[in-house]
């Protein structure tokens, strides 16, 4: 159960970070309203708060979180941007998720 909660927390954290970065991108690159910076700042604040909820040491959390971030970013590419990932993208996600699993589930001394 701990692992499921941890992975779910990683996914929520990644979504908050991606939203917090995507909204300014829309403003800067696609001419969207500057008011998107308000929800972007809120999303990044939520991102930082969610990072603080992770039970492990910060360095380990950031390392393991990277795997979830890559997976969520690829899903974002497909769902939001409408670009289907390549087979190599999926291989890369599998490798990063394997690394995340090793970091999360390795025995601790």
From Swiss-Prot:
TM regions (residue ranges): 7-27, 31-51, 63-83, 87-107
One GO term describing the cellular component: plasma membrane
Subcellular location(s) per record: Cell inner membrane
Disulfide bonds: none
Domain of life assignment: Bacteria
Signal peptide: none
Swiss-Prot/TrEMBL keywords: Cell inner membrane, Cell membrane, Membrane, Transmembrane, Transmembrane helix
A Pfam family of this chain: UPF0060
UniProt membrane topology term: Multi-pass membrane protein
Keyword Transmembrane helix: yes
PANTHER family per the UniProt record, alphabetical: UPF0060 MEMBRANE PROTEIN YNFA (PTHR36116:SF1)
Record-stated family: Belongs to the UPF0060 family.
Name this polypeptide is given: UPF0060 membrane protein mma_0129
